[in-house]
């Protein structure tokens, strides 16, 4: 069971809504993933339409919506988008995203911290997408963010946990949930994140662009479950030396 702010989730896999070939495939994949928290970009939602092709099926699916501020380049733009989301969707939950460079989509640490502090004061439950910077994640936690979402690699790159060393520090020092976001390309990456102590992962591109998104979503669900179970089972420590699993000393002496 994962608790963030005032909500609990059975699934430790969060999903996105971008890049799917159709809204039907999006919903089928989300259901197959078992995800209960789904993020959507406010820039992709037509708030003038009650039957928006993205929003309506998500509401029907009964998932918790996590609107994001993707597209915002400054704290001011993100704060404006956050208020639009709260008014339109009736939720104070927000994935804070500020990335001024459209090529790399790397989060702006200064603007993110600035916006996070303001939004928390305004009553939002803020989950910030950020770089894998232990100092920044601690600062975001201190200003009241409900979780931190450091990247594993650039958005949509499918490179995996390129920031593993920093993620380990973030996880070790955090007192709020850590959700590894961005760069997760295959289910084994998700399993590794849970094994190393992350509370959840957010996956979008790897599922949406797969040849079979529904089955890929299932694979991610199983991988996250396996990674969590492995961590809870207490894996053995790594060693530089070999350790025999079946000592042969007694057997050899008895045969002599």
Swiss-Prot record:
Instruction: Kindly give the CDD domains that the UniProt entry links to this protein.
Output: ThiG
Tell me which UniProt keywords the record has, alphabetically: Cytoplasm, Schiff base, Thiamine biosynthesis, Transferase
Q: List the disulfide bonds.
A: none
Q: In which pathway does it act?
A: Cofactor biosynthesis; thiamine diphosphate biosynthesis
Active-site residues (renumbered)? 95 (schiff-base intermediate with dxp)
Say which domain of life the source belongs to. Bacteria
Q: Does the keyword Transport apply?
A: no
UniProt entry tagged with the keyword Transcription regulation: no
Q: Which InterPro entries match?
A: Aldolase_TIM, Thiazole_synthase_ThiG, ThiG
Subunit annotation? Homotetramer. Forms heterodimers with either ThiH or ThiS.
Q: Write the protein's name.
A: Thiazole synthase
Name the source organism.
Escherichia coli O17:K52:H18 (strain UMN026 / ExPEC)
Tell me the name of the encoding gene.
thiG
